[in-house]
């Protein structure tokens, strides 16, 4: 691959990176967070985004970012190497339990039934967090705007007698990268208790990546201290981006001292340096 510095007019070399103002961390109480943002967003196509994800970036709509927090390295980008993945007994049970769900993959699009499920999910799982009051426009900006190769996956029960669509159970947004699938966001029926739909969704993505010949499923950030993120450590082996390198993680022994230099200012794709 030609180094991007040899292509001064390439989209990668044209990207700029800046740090946001501090804001309250949404994962750890009492922490202050910052993000490093890649701009301009219209230059970030699927190839560029693949390289950014390898460097620990994620996206929210067309906003591409990674943690850039002073004195904190709690957010660890993680991915599952699908060729080595070994499901646990519990995960095998979840796969068997939900394998009758019908998955339909389509381009990103608005659907009133999806939005209604999203609002029920937010009200039940994240009440008071702000997202439970998202308007349709906010929902679309968050999940349905993308400049890369993105897909919407809906999971339903089998069609009812008479041909009526089965009950909608879960909706997931994924990005298709050059080296894997990236899990963007998933929401599901909150009234179905103890279903582990989220676990099943990741297992489904792992199987899809295998079928497409892609080596990884990127799961976003894992935070050891956050109960919401604990499930990601249940997928083995799990690789994390530590000090600019992807390494196999032992979630029980990972050493993450409160030093921001290595992660927050890790090298950027194409040899860029982070900005303060």
UniProtKB/Swiss-Prot annotation:
Transmembrane segments: none annotated. It is an enzyme of class 2 (transferase). The keyword Acyltransferase applies. Keywords: Acyltransferase, Cytoplasm, Transferase. One of its GO terms (biological process) is ubiquitin-dependent protein catabolic process via the N-end rule pathway. It catalyses: N-terminal L-glutamyl-[protein] + L-leucyl-tRNA(Leu) = N-terminal L-leucyl-L-glutamyl-[protein] + tRNA(Leu) + H(+); N-terminal L-aspartyl-[protein] + L-leucyl-tRNA(Leu) = N-terminal L-leucyl-L-aspartyl-[protein] + tRNA(Leu) + H(+). One of its GO terms (cellular component) is cytoplasm. It comes from the Bacteria. Belongs to the R-transferase family. Bpt subfamily. Functions in the N-end rule pathway of protein degradation where it conjugates Leu from its aminoacyl-tRNA to the N-termini of proteins containing an N-terminal aspartate or glutamate. HAMAP family: Bpt (MF_00689). PANTHER family: ARGININE-TRNA-PROTEIN TRANSFERASE 1, ARGINYL-TRNA--PROTEIN TRANSFERASE 1. This is Aspartate/glutamate leucyltransferase. It comes from Burkholderia cenocepacia (strain HI2424). The gene is bpt.
